[in-house]
């Protein structure tokens, strides 16, 4: 444990310089972020929780954690019933709740661009006056980032498909901090 302690302290120090008060090691916040909605998994809190506001900040966080071999756990709103939010090896929980902007809606093309922290209900509220809606309903008010991470589906999947069929592209931060963009606005037609 002593060998892990110094790199973790260094990583948390660098993250604190980057994010200031958007990094917390509060016991209550850590416990909340180490426990999903399913009682099957033992809650395991991270060492710290960070709250990025942009893809670039996520990239910087991931780069710092990777350089110090610090485990990372992404967090939307904690609706996971599969143990995805537990931190069995400690590390940093990356809470995406402050990345909750609907960037644009293209009504004519029936698509939109959102940040990972946008929830299903938030998006549908935003779309309400357009006559459009986001059909994936996993039964919880999950974030779209969390839904993408778990390949969500739900009660409307038979008619509208799963999340897989409703995503045209993603902006992804790789484990080394590199940012890539997948897909595009064109739908596959053959």
What are these regions, as identified by a protein language model?
Residues 24-25, 74, 136:
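A generic structural-conservation signal
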Residues 61, 68, 123:
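Aromatic/hydrophobic pocket-lining residues that form π-stacking "cages" and hydrophobic walls in ligand
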Residues 70-71, 133:
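Residue-level detector of anion-binding/catalytic polar loops
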